[in-house]
Amino acid sequence: MAGNKTILVVDDDMELSDGLRVVLEKQGYRVLQARDGQQGKQMVYQHRPDLVILDMMMPRMGGYPVLEHFRDKPEAPPIIMITANEGSRHKAYAEYLGVVDYIRKPFAMERLLDSVGKALNPQEPETESKEE
């Protein structure tokens, strides 16, 4: 259940960002939007979202500097990275920096909603497909 959870979408592609906002709001989430990593970083401190959906490649400041900034900060919300980049080393670095999920564009909205649900409700048991 979305309840009163707030999600910050940080993406310079406003068409995608607006689409995510519409879908997430229909699920009951409050959605904030930022156009680049610098604005997104400021909004994390201002609004304290419960989750951030972060694009990797953006003008001014991309996703990696945002991840690096929040890596060891206790106030950091969980972050889902979305990207059109195919490189496995990019995924490995994002995971090293602490993303809860790494989703390649284009993606099925159900895939993102599943990831959002898991990130916001980590106490729910996961399937046994994870590494042991």
Language-model segments: what does each one mean?
Residues 18-26:
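Charged docking surfaces used in two-component/phosphorelay signaling
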Residues 21, 65, 86-101, 114:
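Alpha4 helix (beta4-alpha4-beta5 surface) of REC/receiver domains from two-component response regulators
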Residues 35-39, 61-65:
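Acidic catalytic/metal-coordinating carboxylates
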Residues 42, 64-75:
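Short amphipathic alpha-helix used as the core "switch/output" element in two-component signaling
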Residues 47-53:
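Active-site beta3 strand of CheY-like receiver
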Residues 58:
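Receiver (REC) domain active-site loop signature in two-component systems and cognate sites
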Residues 107-116:
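C-terminal output helix
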